[in-house]
Amino acid sequence: MRAHHNGVMTDHIIVLPGGGYTDLSDDEAEPVAAWLAGLGLSSSVFRYPVQTRHPGPLDAVRAEVRRIRADGHERVGLLGFSAGGHAAGHATLAPLSADPDAAAAERVDLAILCYPVVSMELPTHADSRRQLIGLDATPELRASTSLDRLVTRDAPPFFIWHTAEDASVPVQHAYLLATALADHGIPHALHVFSRGRHGLNLAIGQGDAEQWTTLCAAWLREEGWIA
């Protein structure tokens, strides 16, 4: 954890709750920000617009990244669950603004994706696809909103976790993104737990999946975000 001379922490993580781009889960919001605060991190919850088509959520998340950075935070990370994981990954991986100053302001320095929707091409969370791009979206639009298709060698580090028996968002989504990151030489951690339904949030009392917060804290320490 680092701080400016004026006392403002230089690192900040924005939490993006899930909800299938239809609504937003309170369980994946303030409790998660409180956990991050317990690690000594500056954090906030951003309730991005739902029931609106692409690029509405992407533009809103990037505007929030710019706002947080303008407040004095040098490094900005995103942590998202399910559809919020897609929103986090999309803001991290989609092409940046052509203007160098704007691109620097909206850049994401680290991403934590929890049971994320990754691909709009694979079988996916129907609500997410319906709300974001529509079930009749063109192949081009489906590809351009699939995170695994957007990975480049400029991507930041990623932490991803999922459960093998997730019936809402198949675990193949996590594997797809991890494979794309590996193919491009991007540092990343992937944890897949055998048991657990979709939407576990902090996974307290949920078997092995409860380890994700401990594993993530260790990863954040390794990446230099916490002491």
Q: Where are the language model's segments positioned?
A:
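Short beta-strand element of the alpha/beta-hydrolase
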Residues: 11-18
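A fold-wide structural signal in alpha/beta-hydrolase
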Residues: 12, 40-44
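Catalytic nucleophile-loop/oxyanion-hole region of alpha/beta-hydrolase
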Residues: 24-27, 31-32, 44-75, 203-209
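Primarily recognizes the serine-hydrolase "nucleophile elbow" in alpha/beta-hydrolase
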Residues: 63-127, 142
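Mobile cap/lid helix-loop segments that gate and shape the active-site cleft of serine hydrolases
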Residues: 116-150, 156
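Short beta-strand/loop motif that positions the catalytic acidic residue
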Residues: 154, 160-162, 166
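Conserved alpha/beta-hydrolase "acid-adjacent" motif
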Residues: 167-176
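C-terminal catalytic histidine-bearing segment of alpha/beta-hydrolase fold enzymes
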Residues: 175-227
